[in-house]
From Swiss-Prot:
Protein name: 33 kDa chaperonin
PANTHER family per UniProt: 33 KDA CHAPERONIN (PTHR30111:SF1)
Cell compartment(s), UniProt: Cytoplasm
NCBIfam families documented for this protein: PRK00114.1
Lineage: Bacteria, Thermotogati, Deinococcota, Deinococci, Deinococcales
Entry comment on modification after translation: Under oxidizing conditions two disulfide bonds are formed involving the reactive cysteines. Under reducing conditions zinc is bound to the reactive cysteines and the protein is inactive.
Amino acid sequence: MLRGTAAGGTLRLVGIEASKVVEEARRRHNLSKTATAALGRTMAASALLAVVLGKRTDSRVTVRVDGGGPVGWIVAEGSTDGRLRGYVRQPEADLPPRESDGKLDVRGIVGTDGELAVTRLLDNGEPYTGSVRLQSGEIAEDVSRYLGASEQIPNAVLLGVYEEGGRVANAGGLLIQAMPGVTDETLAKLEANIAAMGMLTDQLRNGGLLGAMQQAAAGLDLQLATDAQPAHFSCRCSREKAIDSLKFFGAEERQEMIDEGGQEVLCHWCSEKYHLTPEEIAALDEGEARAEA
């Protein structure tokens, strides 16, 4: 992840190169090509939003997209330190490329009959969720609308995922925020630069994330921050949390799990499977009995 300013500090740029992260998500969830693009865009967006909206160095933002399309809902979590994770409801859902231009039909698989919701922590530690109705279904335009409508942040958002040979070759995102004092001339130059960039994935392939940011801020005196953060797939699940999740089941249900030789718990975020032994499940009952004594 790279951050910077341009035009004398009146533009703020945040970028993420997430090719390895999205490939890891594709592999873990066995995602179809179009589902990979939809989730990858959402994951990149979550990291960018964490930087723009977060108040701490370890702030997290969760983005949920539910447009009623074949892929079902999409959920992604990103943090300011580059940790990302995410999943979709129907990982195998896919659509043929669009007939008009041959590109992946992300809008079709996501749908537009629903909303994009963003959850973050306020200064007091309480979670806050804002949302907008989906209009594009392409993710980037909807994230941009969210920032403008719910957060009153003038912005431009670019997101992209490109697969080659069944693997993610390029994935990432770029968010540009207009700060107080920005001039119409600067905005016009920025708009022209973005229009000339073409596909973000082409920029990432040819010049990397730095090249993409330089292209977006061409002629606007880009100044990069020195606190670059590598992006990586990271899930907070653990065996201990898997065991704790069984506390929501009654004693009879847990006894059935013990009688059947244990229980498998699946983490939806990363598809990690935990096979819990009868002894681990029985220990829950013993712990509850001691607590009640």
